[in-house]
């Protein structure tokens, strides 16, 4: 009955000129917004840390340039100047009332950091197909041994049980 219904449905769709499987729009981009925002955030953080590291190395190699950079960061920014502010700098310069106002942002940032740490501990290893086959064979052999062990144990239990005629 069910098979007949499906056949009638398919033939009816084809008879009308419609394809059996309705055409769906596959042009929709699926984006995991949380993952994208976390990666974007941590890419910015990494760039800031790398920039800071480079500036520190430059200031060690060229002390006069480092003083000039430090002086320029203390002055108010001019139009078009890039400013990189890290969370540590913000914590030192903000008052407690400002921190309370930005508490939700800080909580969000902390959650993002924790999520990134979790993701960074997740590793995906690609295993060659030969290894997969070897592993599968080993696993099948383990299962066979455990089944044969269970069968031996149950056979021993059965042979040691008193039969109904012995009672």
Curated annotation (Swiss-Prot):
Tissue specificity as recorded in UniProt: Expressed specifically in testis.
Modified residues (Phosphoserine): 26, 129
Gene Ontology CC: one annotated term: sperm flagellum
Keyword Kinase: no
Localization, UniProt: Mitochondrion outer membrane; Mitochondrion; Cell projection, Cilium, Flagellum
Superkingdom to which the source organism belongs: Eukaryota
Transit peptide residues according to the UniProt entry: 1-24
Pfam families given in the database record: SPATA19 (PF15212)
Keywords, comma-separated and alphabetical: Cell projection, Cilium, Developmental protein, Differentiation, Flagellum, Membrane, Mitochondrion, Mitochondrion outer membrane, Phosphoprotein, Spermatogenesis, Transit peptide
Biological process per Gene Ontology, one example term: sperm mitochondrion organization
Keyword Ribonucleoprotein recorded: no
Main location: mitochondrion
Reported function: Essential for sperm motility and male fertility. Plays an important role in sperm motility by regulating the organization and function of the mitochondria and is also required for correct sperm midpiece assembly.
Designated name of the protein: Spermatogenesis-associated protein 19, mitochondrial
Source organism of the structure: Homo sapiens (Human)
Gene this chain is encoded by: SPATA19
């Amino acid at each position: 009955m069910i098979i007949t219904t499906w056949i009638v449905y398919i033939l009816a769709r084809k008879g009308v000129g419609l394809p059996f499987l309705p055409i769906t729009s596959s042009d929709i981009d699926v984006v995991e917004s949380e993952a994208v925002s976390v990666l974007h955030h941590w890419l910015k953080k990494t760039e800031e840390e790398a920039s800071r590291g480079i500036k520190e190395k430059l200031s060690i190699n060229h002390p006069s340039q480092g003083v000039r950079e430090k002086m320029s960061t203390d002055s108010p920014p001019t139009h078009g100047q890039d400013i990189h502010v890290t969370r540590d700098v913000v914590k030192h310069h903000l008052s407690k009332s400002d921190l309370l106002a930005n508490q939700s942002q800080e909580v969000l940032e902390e959650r993002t950091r924790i999520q990134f740490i979790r993701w960074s501990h997740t590793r995906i290893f690609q295993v060659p197909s030969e290894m997969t086959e070897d592993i599968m064979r080993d696993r099948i052999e383990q299962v066979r041994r455990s089944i044969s062990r269970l069968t031996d144990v149950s056979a021993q239990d059965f042979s040691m049980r008193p039969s109904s005629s012995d009672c």
